[in-house]
Amino acid sequence: ATEIPDSLFEQAIACIKRFEGWHGKHLPYVGWGHKLLPGETFRPDMSKAQADSLLRADLRKLCRMCSRFGKDALLVATLSYNVGYYRVVGYGKIPKSRLIQKLEAGDRDIYNEYVSFRCYKGKVVPSIERRRKVEYMLLFKK
């Protein structure tokens, strides 16, 4: 597995916090966008330190799950944090995204595929598009 530099990981954390914002009253999301899983008892009024720790644990877990993508692991993990791991990599009846198909084929020309994850209910959302462009600019390494 490719080692992710701490500075790059910190940029991903800052980027997620910036665009995700604080989820204080939006269950099932808490903290910086953590989706509550069955059995979890995190509360919307958690401290910022607790939420930061949870975000880091979530992103590290996703990085491990995405480690097969080498230097693109952090980029794919950051996208997965927001849209869901299986929507990106596929599972069962959910097909692999075009982004993953290209990466698996060794094609790293993925800007358009990455930024295509910018819709909500079938419509392009400008703020999500901005987020994808910033994530790509910060985290894609040649």
Language model region names:
Residues 66-73:
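Structural motif
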Residues 1-26, 34-41, 46-65, 85-142:
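Long, amphipathic alpha-helical surface segments
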Residues 74-87:
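Short N-proximal segments of mature Sec-exported proteins
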